[in-house]
Amino acid sequence: TRRVIRALEVCISTGKTFSEQRTKTKPNYDILTFGLTMERSDLYARIDERIDNMFDNGWIEEVYGLLDKGYTWDMPSMSALGYPEVGSFIRDEFDLMEAKRRIRRISRKLVRRQYSWFSMNDTSINWYEMKYMSLAELYSVAVSWMNSIP
């Protein structure tokens, strides 16, 4: 529903229909798109570690700070991945273990949706298996590509 509301806002503010706003011409710039893949079990382990780190580094305190500054749970920013679960923990609706479990589950669902959304057969995406490539190597690929543009 947020996307529909935003689309309507744009149409009203520009006076153009959505189809009129879509450009049909090819952009006058080149695009390099990376697709990063990883064994699902490795990715899930990294997700688990990241969630634990976020809590260890003050995620709960961050949310309390946002609430103190006037943020409310009906704001779009407070519906970002994990924030509703942190909110439920803060409101004593469930314990920390359950909050982490739910955030892990939601994160895994997002991974599955992203793997479905981005096709491995899409030739406009340069796919890299992260088990065999470091971020430094990816950076080198990007720099080489940029340097090859006339």
Each model region followed by its residue ranges:
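Phosphate/Mg2+-binding loops and adjacent switch elements
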Residues: 1-31
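Catalytic core of IPPT-family isopentenyl/dimethylallyl transferases
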Residues: 27-150
